[in-house]
Amino acid sequence: MLAMSDFCTQHPLFSYAVAIVVLLAAMLGLGAVSGTRRVGAARGRSMDLPFESGVLPVGSAHLRIPVQYYLVAMLFVIFDVESVFLFSWAPVAVGAGWRGYGAVVVFVASLAAALAYVWRWGALDWGPVPRRRIDYRRAGDASCAGR
């Protein structure tokens, strides 16, 4: 006859399944005991909605997200990957010599050029483009003739 410890060592999958069932039962039981009870005034329209805190929703859920969020997210991912390359180069910097240093200088220069291009392109600008104010006193009488 097998002892319980021998059975567990010979059938680890069964022990694993029993442990999962026990943990699931414990979590469901604790959730049922400690969960909120919807009784009386607490049970209403706001408690039946799938929103956090039971707060009634206001407005539409279909909001347009500005493109700037996506641009900044893409730029973050690009520069984050490039920083990983630099951090992986740092431990071998001394062993790489001047040739490795030159390669990293070219790499960082191309990063700086890309950042300058993106900045000049306006991908890092937030909000609407400011309008230029026309100073009619400096423009002369010709620009004010139509007024």
Curated annotation (Swiss-Prot):
InterPro entries: NAD(P)H_OxRDtase_bac/plastid (IPR023043), NADH_UbQ/plastoQ_OxRdtase_su3 (IPR000440), NDAH_ubi_oxred_su3_sf (IPR038430). The keyword Transmembrane applies. Keywords: Cell inner membrane, Cell membrane, Membrane, NAD, Quinone, Translocase, Transmembrane, Transmembrane helix, Transport, Ubiquinone. It is a multi-pass membrane protein. Coiled coil: none annotated. Belongs to the complex I subunit 3 family. HAMAP family: NDH1_NuoA (MF_01394). NDH-1 is composed of 14 different subunits. Subunits NuoA, H, J, K, L, M, N constitute the membrane sector of the complex. NDH-1 shuttles electrons from NADH, via FMN and iron-sulfur (Fe-S) centers, to quinones in the respiratory chain. The immediate electron acceptor for the enzyme in this species is believed to be ubiquinone. Couples the redox reaction to proton translocation (for every two electrons transferred, four hydrogen ions are translocated across the cytoplasmic membrane), and thus conserves the redox energy in a proton gradient. This is NADH-quinone oxidoreductase subunit A. It comes from Gluconacetobacter diazotrophicus (strain ATCC 49037 / DSM 5601 / CCUG 37298 / CIP 103539 / LMG 7603 / PAl5).
